[in-house]
Curated annotation (Swiss-Prot):
Keywords: Apoplast, Cell wall, Cell wall biogenesis/degradation, Disulfide bond, Glycoprotein, Glycosidase, Hydrolase, Secreted, Signal, Transferase. Its EC number is 2.4.1.207. Xyloglucan binds at E104, H117, T118, N119, D127, R128, E129, E193, W194, G198, R274. Induction: By auxin and brassinolide. Up-regulated by abscisic acid (ABA). This is Probable xyloglucan endotransglucosylase/hydrolase protein 23. Glycans are attached at N108, N233. The lineage of its organism: Eukaryota, Viridiplantae, Streptophyta, Embryophyta, Tracheophyta. The gene is XTH23.
Length: 286
């Protein structure tokens, strides 16, 4: 039998500890932060539900902070007349110059599709919205929504299909979130002033409580504890197939084009009226 050197074992062990890869348990890995009992964890930590009524919504956050990672969550959205409601799932750092990577699901009248709203904030500045309709009913079953965030890019995916990529273009003067650790947050709340048809359709409280369900939370990430990352000296040069160096291959690019050609309903990069002084630099570079 071939001998394995001590140094090889040590390197393998160190590599295994560098990156946290966990199929999370809600009881162990998140905390419900608001809602006065409207957030519930059941099934031995495998299922979490958030509810919204006229008095309050609810929300939770990860216990871990991340500086780069791939975060997956399976969500079943509010069914029926969800107009006025927003289910948000995002990464965010604290403070007034925060970074943020957003999925927001804007409810609608029964039979009308949800709007999936995405955005990227760097140092407190957003205005990078792209919106989509989904090609399935997100209320009839769970679907996986993923954020891949590495030093070179952010990729938003739905059931493994990439829908948006935001590249690191710092060399061209565009800010990119890379220095501030972020937690995962999710919430269900009332946004009837703007969420559905620009606020024209209000929340029908006779349909309350509204409920969103979560399972399959997975974090494969560089976890930050007491200011120290579990992935020291991250440069984006991960092992082959690692999310740390992942980029879209030709198949992924084709899938993203299909989604954007058929299901994108708003793109800030084509909204010249919104930016009379000129489109953002990342739009011109793309």
């Amino acid at each position: 039998m071939a001998m394995i050197s001590y140094s090889t074992i040590v390197v393998a062990l160190l590599a295994s500890f560098m990156i946290c890869s966990v199929s999370a348990n809600f009881q162990r890995d998140v905390e419900i932060t608001w809602g006065d009992g409207r957030g519930q964890i059941t099934n031995n930590g495998d299922l979490l539900t958030l509810s919204l009524d006229k008095a309050s919504g609810s929300g939770f956050q990860s216990k871990n902070e991340y500086l780069f990672g791939k975060i997956d969550m399976q969500i079943k959205l509010v069914a029926g007349n969800s107009a006025g409601t927003v289910t948000a799932y995002y990464l965010k750092s604290p403070g007034s110059t925060w970074d943020e990577i957003d999925f927001e699901f804007l409810g609608n009248l029964s039979g009308d599709p949800y709007t999936l709203h995405t955005n990227v904030f760097t140092q407190g500045k957003g205005d990078r919205e792209q919106q989509f309709k989904l090609w399935f009913d997100p209320t009839s079953d769970f679907h996986t929504y993923s954020i891949l965030w590495n030093p070179q890019r952010i990729i938003f995916s739905v059931d493994g299909t990439p829908i948006r990529e935001f590249k690191n273009m710092e060399s061209q003067g565009t800010l990119f979130p890379k220095n501030q650790p972020m937690r995962m947050y999710s919430s269900l709340w009332n946004a009837e002033e703007w969420a559905t048809r620009g606020g024209l359709v209000k929340t029908d409280w006779s349909k309350a409580p509204f409920t969103a369900s979560y399972r399959g939370f997975n974090e494969e990430a560089c976890v930050v504890i007491n200011g120290q990352s579990s992935c020291p000296n991250v440069s984006g040069q991960g092992s082959t197939g690692s999310w740390l160096s992942q980029e879209l291959d030709s198949t992924g690019q084709e899938q993203m084009r299909w989604v954007q050609n058929n299901y994108m309903i708003y793109n800030y990069c084509t909204d010249a009226k919104r930016f009379p002084q000129g489109l953002p630099r990342e739009c011109l570079a793309a």
